[in-house]
UniProtKB/Swiss-Prot annotation:
Assembly and binders: Homopentamer.
Function summary: Channel that opens in response to stretch forces in the membrane lipid bilayer. May participate in the regulation of osmotic pressure changes within the cell.
Subcellular localization, as worded in the UniProt entry: Cell inner membrane
Top-level taxon: Bacteria
Keyword tags: Cell inner membrane, Cell membrane, Ion channel, Ion transport, Membrane, Transmembrane, Transmembrane helix, Transport
Transmembrane segments: 14-34, 38-58, 82-102
Protein name per the record: Large-conductance mechanosensitive channel
Encoding gene (name): mscL
The keyword Cell inner membrane appears for this protein: yes
Annotated organism of origin: Rhizobium meliloti (strain 1021)
Homology family: Belongs to the MscL family.
Length: 142
């Protein structure tokens, strides 16, 4: 059973998946930075400044009166939809970037396939040529 597990782990697909997960985790930090440091300030400038989704919430009890999400969570239950909006924006940006990368890779593959000329047919081996000549001579005698 241990040997089967080793074979399973050593397969290329499992290793590729592991590398993809690690790179994806690192890439998600880049997307978070793009959203929080580049996109959200632009959205804030368009909507009148100071626009921040993180403090958007609905109190689920009457005891919640705080203006910020962290303080409201200390007072009671809240429906923090602002964080969801931020995560949704992160996902959409990540999905768009992955779509563009896949499109770029597919275009590069198609270009390589288009530029690739078919290999010329290799000449037949010497023994095949000799056998063909013998066949032709036998046909001429008959």
């Amino acid at each position: 059973m241990l040997n089967e597990f080793k074979e399973f782990i050593a397969r290329g697909n499992v290793m590729d998946l592991a590398v993809g997960v690690i790179i994806g985790a690192a890439f998600s930090k880049i997307v978070d930075s793009v959203v929080n440091d580049l996109v959200m300030p632009v959205v804030g400038a368009i909507t009148g400044g100071g626009f921040d989704f993180s403090n958007y919430f609905l109190p689920l009890s009457a005891s919640v009166t705080a203006p910020t999400l962290s303080a409201a969570r200390e007072q009671g239950a809240v429906f923090a939809y602002g964080n969801f909006i931020t995560v949704l924006i992160n996902f959409l940006i990540l999905a768009w970037i992955i779509f563009l990368l896949i499109k770029l890779v597919n275009r590069a593959r198609a270009s390589v396939e288009r530029d690739k000329a078919p290999d010329p047919a290799a000449p037949p081996p010497q023994d095949i040529l000799l056998l063909s000549e013998i066949r032709d001579l036998l046909r001429q005698r008959a």
